[in-house]
Amino acid sequence: MAAPKLGRARYRNNMRQAHSRVVTIMCALCFLAQGAAAAPQRVVSTFLCTDEYVFRLVPRERIAALSYEAVDRRPVVSTIADAARGIATIRPSTETVLARSPDLVVMYAGTNPRLHVNLKKLGVPILDVPWANSLADVRVITTMLGEKLGAPDKAQAMLAEMDREISRARASAPKPPVKGILFEPNGYASMGGITDEVMALSGVSNVAPPAMLTRTGTLPVEALIASAPELLILGGEARVGSARAYMVLHHPALAALKGRTLMEFAVLTPLLCPGPWSLNSAATFGDLARRARLAPSRASP
């Protein structure tokens, strides 16, 4: 009689294990179903830099609206200006946001404070996105947004592509790096942050003199010329008169750098908003750095 008793014991044990596996699987399925149900179904983005993320992470049918800047072409300030056509856009206000019946409003922290206060009073769910000051910040923010928007796999895919861009930039960057300055509309000289990181990865060492920057972050043309960089990247369009802010990029005094500095215009839209797509500018920086390194002698005439 011992054998049958042992058989029944094994049977009960096997059944317990099978039941445990079934319960585990069912719990996992329930969790996934809850996660899918919890993903926001009508997302409104109120700022250009949140548009960039929402468009990439949220299916079109779940995007209730992006900001008008996402598809603006006067000028183009978005990397998704063409791809996002057909999606509803708004000029963010309490009225325009509520008209889209959102179940989540994605805002950049600190932007449009009055709208933020009004939506909070009305109980509208808000996701505040912090500004990224480094590529490390980009990783944290992208992962967070992937979780909050129900798209963790998409977020990780974006970061994986960013890492591939970083590897490509490093592999082709000139060594030692080229001494360069990024001079932007109104005379702003980019210093620090993600732009500096992308430049460095691409083989450009930012030599804009911090001590010569004004309180507003602009660099006087005289200080720029005195720095005599190997590479001067003029951030924007080459055509004169496209906007008053671009006039300084055509300053006649910059002619003093001819023969010793490679000067080139470059549209760097991916750097306007920090995110994994910012690495798309690495190829532009790298190409300019290699050209500056291979250029003939730039000794002053």
Mark where each language-model region is:
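Bacterial N-terminal signal peptides
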Residues: V23-A33
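A short, structured surface patch at a secondary-structure boundary
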Residues: R42-G110, R114, V204-V207
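Short helix-initiation/N-cap motifs at beta->coil->alpha
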Residues: R85-E95, A132, M212-V221
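Boundary at the C-terminal end of the N-terminal hydrophobic targeting segment
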Residues: G35-P40
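Structured C-terminal subdomain patch of bacterial secreted/periplasmic proteins
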Residues: Q41-R42, D137-E147, Q156, G236-P301
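His/Asp/Glu-enriched short active-site or ligand-binding loop at hydrolase and phosphoryl-transfer sites
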Residues: S67, P75, I194-T216, G236, ...
